[in-house]
Amino acid sequence: MPIVMDMNMLLMLSLAFTVMAPASASSSRFTQPPQSQAIVENDAADFSCEATGPSGDLHYEWLHNGQQIGYDSRVLQIGSNLRIESVQREDAGDYVCIAASAASGARQASPPAKLSVIFLDAVTVQLLGSNRNELLLKCHVEGASGDEPLQIEWYRDSAKLSSWQNVELQQHRLLVRQPSSADDGLYRCIASNAAARVMSKQGYVYEHLASVAPGSTKCLPKLKRNQKMPESWGKQVFLCRGKRGGSTGMDQSQSLPPSPEGLRIVQGPNDKLIIKEGEPTTLSCLYELPAELQNQRIQLRWRKDGKILRHVELGDAVVPGLALDHGKDALVREDGRLVLHKQNGTLSFNSIIASDAGQYMCQIQLEGHAPVNSAPGALEVIEQLKFMPQPTSKNLELGALGKLHCKAQGTPTPQVQWLRDAANGSLPEHVDDINGTLIFRNVSAEHRGNYTCVASNSQGQINATVAINVVVAPRFSVAPEGPIESSEQGVAVIHCQAIGDPKPTIQWDKDLKYLSENNTDRQRFSFLENGTLEIRNVQAEDEGKYGCTIGNSAGLKREEVRLLVRGNGDGFITEESAGDGFLVTRAVLITMTVALAYIVLVVGLMLWCRYRRQARKARLNELSIKEAGGDQAESGKNTEQEPCLSKQRNGHGKSRTAANGDAQKSDDTACSQQSKASKKSAHIYEQLALPRSGLSELIQIGRGEFGDVFVGKLKASLVAAASPSDKDADTEKQHSNSENGSGASGASGCGSGSTTLSTLNEKRRSKTSMDDIEEIKEEEQPQEQAQSESTADLLVMVKALNKVKDEQACQEFRRQLDLLRAISHKGVVRLFGLCREKDPHYMVLEYTDWGDLKQFLLATAGKVNTATATSSPPPLTTSQLLAVAYQIARGMDAIYRARFTHRDLATRNCVISSEFIVKVAYPALCKDKYSREYHKHRNTLLPVRWLAPECIQEDEYTTKSDIFAFAVVVWELFNQATKLPHEDLSNEQVVQRSLANTLEWSVAEGTPDGLKEILLSCWLTNPKERPSFSQLGAALSKAMQAAEK
């Protein structure tokens, strides 16, 4: 069912798309799209529409059910808004607002807004079932109420019913359980909505069988003239069958005594009254009521065509049960045009309509007596000449049969004729006018033009002109054919070409989701002018069902094709190989048999070898224990204390290996404790080794996720002693492993190897512009200065791994270590080394003299006390803030090019030096200093106010989620870090709105106009629609140049 609904919505939006040219990247956005609404018939409806764009550049159009609206005195376009003065039922449907740019020609369609018309015509009571156990009635309503439910009321005689005892109300139904004589009466229902309140035309009379006595209806055989009824007939029971539409009983009024002579009608309605439609009129009913009858129960009624239209009580008491007659209809309904005056019995009409025509009679009835009736009077209405409904323009398909209706009402009946707006006014060939219906036998191009419908009678003549447009339904000249197979990294071409008049537009979708230049990768997806879709560098996620929808004002057509992506080494069985099925099956069976025999042989050999190894290993272990003594226990203890990062073993371990070479070889064969990847990782960590004695003046600044964080000093000679050739060789090897499929995972499990791309190769491959060449030179210059100043101490940040047995903390420690080890960029802090002689392990990182960026911003904003100056430093200028953001973007772009993600980008995790150089760092002081900026979600501390929705929803971290966080960093910069993002919301509320994709972002005050659009795009829900760091760097560079002017 959801797929069907999505398909209907797809076709509806495609219909609106047929009138639009493809939208460019600069297309407008709707700030106030039209809203769906329900309107009472004949009331006014207003649709608002407003889009962003240069003033005077946009103009608006409206579509109704995919057709352009023809405006008249009732349907008006006021500016960009649409107003319908008197809503009719044919106005119901979907309305779409089109905003078109006069400069670029781009056209944008709003989401459809639905108009529902509320009306109420007639109500009837239907019998669904009647037996001794239950009576079931239904209130059938002809009308519509939009989204609001109809209000149904049930009455028995004049008493309103509710669910009580044996009576149960079920929406439109009335159920009476175990009916008895107490349930006898006339059942009616009243339906009401915003349009009207209408009572059922026909009620249902229920009479319990046990209460009907033989002969109670006085149903006797018809006697001939002068024939007397035998006395025996009065004691017999006769079967009565009334005529169709009649009654088996006698009229109650015939069995009642006549009214007193003083009660009479002096003057009734005129014999015949002719009134024009829309004019007022009055029907007279003058009566005399004696004084002695003032306290009696008397009712005055007006009947139309024998049915009660209005009634009023004349006496001082209310007459129950006199409002309606059993077995007859009632026309009593709320209508402000009719007024019954109690003083003189006059019935007034404020405005006559055509349905008021009929025979009227005035009636007075005293309780228990027969009614007094006036002479009937006829009311004739001269109906105004008008079209019903108004003819509208229409599109006819070339070569098909077309019809255009024109109906008119009036007194006398008008004559309807069609004319063509031409020199002679005659209709073209193969076009006939039959009783006001224009029939086109075979629609051709010459039938295009304006046609006028003329209706005339004795009142005069009216006309309506409509436009006939001849269109050609869209059809495929080249339809998509499939399935289409493509290999990964290959090129897939899906053809779709269409012809028609007007020229059809082509819209592609994948798995019922629209594809356009805005929501696809432009480097891989190309929408050619002829409609063909080309996909370059095919990925596995591109596999799916692709649909091509073509359409114009004549209709829509759609074809689907499936794209299958074949990975390396994968294959598909096609229909061409179906004939060779038997040969393939036989080959598979033979292969499986040989493989099974080989497996059995190998398993047998393995079991035999394993038995021998275990026996030999047991003997050698006994010898090892005797020779090594307690060394083995000490080694095992150290191994247990360091589950994440292994240390190099010295002394006894080496001598034992030399003495028991065969035993060691046997152990490695039996069960290896370290993979090749972990050995290589241990080799890398040995290259990063720093002596703990080289650190001095350690001062704790906070606590992170896996341990304490310090600031201290490191001897520069230890850093200068490291060989750069070793690091280059190591990074070259990492690049080789990455190319062979090892990947560059940003985080791995404890004890597993992790490899990244070489920073050197990234520079050679990605830095091609003059800007990047200068960056490489700037990075090399500090290295030369560091070698010349090897005697000075370096300011460092030290992160300790205290939770050595926490697998999650260990994994995060390794991820940050691999991230900072792989990056060599002036915008990212440098990893100096790793101290692993004893617990806890220390990660030694570069630090700056001015510390973290957030505290610097707070100091310049005057929010913290500075110890080095008597007054607060001045706030940063816009150019300086842009320079900070630009440096952070350059650093994050380097992380992206190394195929890593940061996951916690914020001003608190960046550092700034006195030379105004900003670097991306990773203090992550989530336990104390910045604990209020983290929230525990799914048993993990997360910076939820900086995270993209997919990180909270699916724990999915990508470069696009770092771009989301970068936009929040820019928001912090222009707020001087004095506010938290969404500080009016709690952390739980931020998480809930992120999960529901309802968290709204806006740029900070003071943000340059040139950055607002690209920063807002960083916060889009779809990660594919967010920009890249290179695009952000280019935008920031332009903004810096504009700010300096």
UniProtKB/Swiss-Prot annotation:
Glycosylation positions in this chain: N344, N424, N435, N442, N450, N463, N518, N530
Membrane topology: Single-pass type I membrane protein
Compositional bias (Acidic residues): 771-782
Pfam family, one: Ig_3
Gene3D superfamilies xrefs: Immunoglobulins, Phosphorylase Kinase, domain 1, Transferase(Phosphotransferase) domain 1
Subcellular location, record wording: Cell membrane
Residues of the Protein kinase domain: 695-1040
Cysteines joined through disulfide linkages: C49-C97, C139-C189, C285-C362, C406-C453, C496-C548
Gene Ontology biological-process annotations: cell adhesion; cell surface receptor protein tyrosine kinase signaling pathway; imaginal disc-derived female genitalia morphogenesis; imaginal disc-derived male genitalia morphogenesis; internal genitalia morphogenesis; negative regulation of canonical Wnt signaling pathway; photoreceptor cell axon guidance; positive regulation of neuron projection development
UniProt xrefs under InterPro entries: Ig-like_dom, Ig-like_dom_sf, Ig-like_fold, Ig_I-set, Ig_sub, Ig_sub2, Kinase-like_dom_sf, Prot_kinase_dom
Modified residues (Phosphoserine): S681
GO MF annotation terms: ATP binding; cell adhesion molecule binding; protein heterodimerization activity; protein homodimerization activity; protein kinase activity; signaling receptor activity; transmembrane receptor protein tyrosine kinase activity; Wnt-protein binding
Database matches in PROSITE patterns: IG_LIKE, PROTEIN_KINASE_DOM, PROTEIN_KINASE_TYR
Span of the signal peptide: 1-25
Keywords (A to Z) from UniProt: Cell adhesion, Cell membrane, Disulfide bond, Glycoprotein, Immunoglobulin domain, Membrane, Neurogenesis, Phosphoprotein, Receptor, Repeat, Signal, Transmembrane, Transmembrane helix
Skewed-composition ranges (Gly residues): 743-752
Keyword Transferase included in the entry's annotation: no
Domain Ig-like C2-type: start-end pairs: 26-116, 115-200, 260-373, 376-469, 474-564
Region named Disordered: 628-676, 722-790
Stretches that traverse the bilayer: 588-608
Biased composition (Basic and acidic residues): 725-736
Subunit structure: Interacts with plexA; component of a receptor complex that mediates the repulsive signaling in response to Semaphorin ligands.
Classification via PANTHER family: TYROSINE-PROTEIN KINASE RECEPTOR, TYROSINE-PROTEIN KINASE RYK
Family (UniProt): Belongs to the protein kinase superfamily. Tyr protein kinase family. Insulin receptor subfamily.
Protein name: Tyrosine-protein kinase-like otk
Organism, as annotated: Drosophila mojavensis
